[in-house]
A protein has these predicted regions:
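Extracellular loop and loop/strand-boundary signature of outer-membrane beta-barrel proteins
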Residues: 152-155, 197-202, 239-244, 283-285, ...
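N-terminal periplasmic/intermembrane-space "pro-region" immediately following the signal or transit peptide
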Residues: 28-157
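N-terminal secretory signal peptides that target proteins for export/translocation
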Residues: 1-8
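Short loop/turn motifs that connect adjacent beta-strands in outer-membrane beta-barrel proteins
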Residues: 57-59, 81-95, 114-127, 171-179, ...
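Surface-exposed loop and membrane-interface regions of Gram-negative outer-membrane beta-barrel proteins
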Residues: 159-161, 179-217, 235-245, 385
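Signature for the C-terminal beta-barrel architecture of outer-membrane proteins
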Residues: 233, 253-438, 454-461, 466, ...
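Bacterial N-terminal signal peptides
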Residues: 12-23
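Outer-membrane beta-barrel "beta-signal"
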Residues: 299, 352, 501, 539-553
Length: 553
């Protein structure tokens, strides 16, 4: 009991020490978080890349419905004040704003951006829900029965026809509490795994219904305390991020941070906007050290409207038999040199990332809406060298929100590399692995960060285009090599196409097809230590077809 009290005190101290001097940009009110991959994230990022939304922190996710509404409200104010010149961007902006205003109407009404109707009285209790259901037909070739799904919370493609359905309900109480619950049904048990997928230690899922996410968030002044199960994405990447994504099964955790961006007081106010995020999570039971802990800390900084910078650090410690307690173990890890032993030992990762908007420049940046460049540089263990750490990985990308004037096509190109250290030093299996924590920085064998894992490269290209205001067509290409440090490693080529139909502003249907050709496919064969077994001489040809419906209430 005392240990739990110490943990909570330490987390509270991190934010409160800063928050006592913080000046919130606006009144911070309790609000439920938008789930990762909600369509509003893409819409807000696109409008930010176009320069229509400014002063927006969009890298760290999730953020709340109220925060999203504030970004939309700010853009509406700029449009009403004629701060945005009429040009070809409106062909993209108008349908996006229509959907965003329908989605966040209650929040925009509270902000005064939209006039409240007489039939819409303010209420102490605000609630809503989202229904998602998908029907899939998967064919996994090469003698394989499952294939991991990237950024799907520990899920797998599993042979056969199946259904997945979840309902995400939320409730806000006054200005201080927000509750979210999301149970999920899967008709194929093999669509989820709690351990190895091949070999004598195979541990597949045995539940048709499980709790995907659930949380209670309390907000006071500009401090948000949240407890429950959930996912986070810390990094500017679209197809992955080095430290934290939703590739692995959702984490059970306590989160503490600033609910909204803030400015420093007095003369420091002009330095820009800041935001702090932290969490303490518990990993699964059946691993090297049962219920090992992860502490994460992130500082977001927006010095100007066109640039966002972030610093992130993850610390793995504790677990059954380790003799470590929180917060002492984290403090020791922060102050000690690397490669300690005994109760001083820990596993760490850190990154610095940025997102920058580059406006249109004649003959140099010909795109009508400009472009966005972003990147992430990470270190496994301590950042022992400057500027490039000795155990580095990186991610870089460009996003063009509007390729041609008067058109709606966009383009994203993203490259990630966790094989950099092996090529430079010869060290194999550095990222997501650790000599003492032999299960690594993983949950059920899935990396907490990028889905490609260690010693890997990933090239991702995606383009979308609106055929009409209600129909969006998307194409993606992905080339990936995993575990390049092994004599036999995996090579994947993937192509996909998807069509989204917005039936109404709050209902959409998506049809999708994915083709994969994988040479030497890999499967998890052990968690302790982590081992992935690759099938030499095997080429798997996979076909995935699916249809999903999403309805907001």
């Amino acid at each position: 009991m005392r240990a739990r009290t110490d943990r909570l005190r330490f987390l509270v101290a991190i934010v409160l020490a800063a928050s006592l001097a913080l000046v919130p940009v606006g009144v911070a009110l309790a609000s439920v978080n938008l789930p990762l991959h909600h369509w509003a994230y893409d819409a807000i990022e696109r409008l930010t890349a176009l320069g229509i939304i400014d002063q927006a922190m969009v890298v760290a996710k999730p953020y709340s419905r109220k925060q999203a509404a504030q970004y939309v409200a700010r853009a509406i104010e700029r449009i009403r004040a004629d701060e945005i010149r009429p040009d070809s961007r409106e062909i993209l902006a108008e349908p996006l704003f229509e959907r965003l205003m329908a989605e966040f109407r209650p929040e925009l009404t509270d902000l005064g951006t939209i006039v409240r109707k007489r039939t819409e009285p303010s209420s102490t209790f605000r609630y809503g829900a989202r229904l998602q259901t998908e029907v899939d037909a998967f064919s996994v070739g090469g003698g394989q029965t499952v294939r991991f799904r990237e950024n799907r919370g520990g899920e797998y493609y599993a042979n056969g026809v199946q259904n997945q359905t979840d309902v995400r309900g939320w409730l806000e109480v006054g200005d201080w509490a927000a509750i979210t619950v999301q149970p999920k049904f899967i008709s194929n048990l093999n669509a989820l795994s709690h351990g190895p997928t091949v070999g004598p230690l195979t541990s597949l899922n045995d539940q048709y219904v499980y709790l995907r996410e659930a949380s209670l968030k309390l907000t006071f002044w500009n401090v948000a305390l949240e407890a429950g199960r959930g996912t986070q994405w810390w990094g500017p990447g679209y197809h992955g991020s080095l430290l934290l994504t939703d590739h692995a099964f959702p984490l059970d955790m306590i989160k503490l941070g600033s609910e909204e961006a803030f400015r420093l007081p007095w003369k420091l106010r002009d330095l820009g906007e800041w935001k702090i995020n932290s969490f303490l999570a518990q990993l699964e039971k059946n691993r090297d050290f049962s219920h090992a802990k992860i502490f994460g800390l992130r500082l977001n900084y927006l010095p100007t409207a066109w640039l966002e910078v972030g610093l992130t650090r993850l610390t793995q410690f504790g677990g059954h038999g380790r003799g470590q307690s929180f917060p002492k173990a984290v403090v020791d890890c922060y102050k000690n040199p690397p490669n300690q032993t005994g109760t001083q030992d820990c596993n760490e990762q850190s990154t610095i990332d940025f997102r920058a908007r580059v406006p249109q420049v004649p003959y140099l940046i010909p795109f009508p809406g400009g472009m966005q460049i972003y990147g992430e540089l990470g270190s496994e263990d301590k950042w022992s060298q400057v500027p490039i750490p000795s155990r580095a990985a990186y991610l870089a990308g460009i996003y063009i929100p509007q390729l041609f004037k008067g058109d709606t096509q966009d383009l994203r190109i993203e490259y990630a590399d966790t094989d950099y250290t092996r090529r430079k030093t010869g060290l194999v299996g550095v990222w997501y692995n650790n000599g003492n924590y032999t299960s690594g920085m993983r949950q059920y064998g899935f990396p907490l960060g990028h889905s490609m894992g260690t010693d890997a490269i990933d090239m991702y290209i995606r383009t979308t285009r609106y055929l009409t205001d209600q129909l969006q067509l998307g194409h993606s290409f992905n080339y990936q090599e995993r575990a390049r440090g092994l004599p036999v490693h995996e090579r994947k080529q993937e192509m996909s196409v998807d069509l989204t139909w917005w039936v109404t502003a709050r209902t959409h249907i998506t049809l999708g097809y994915t083709y994969q050709r994988i040479k030497t496919p890999g499967q998890i064969s052990s968690i302790t230590p982590f081992v992935e077994t690759f099938a030499p001489g095997v080429t798997a040809t996979n076909h995935f077809v699916g249809m999903s419906l999403s309805k907001e209430f």
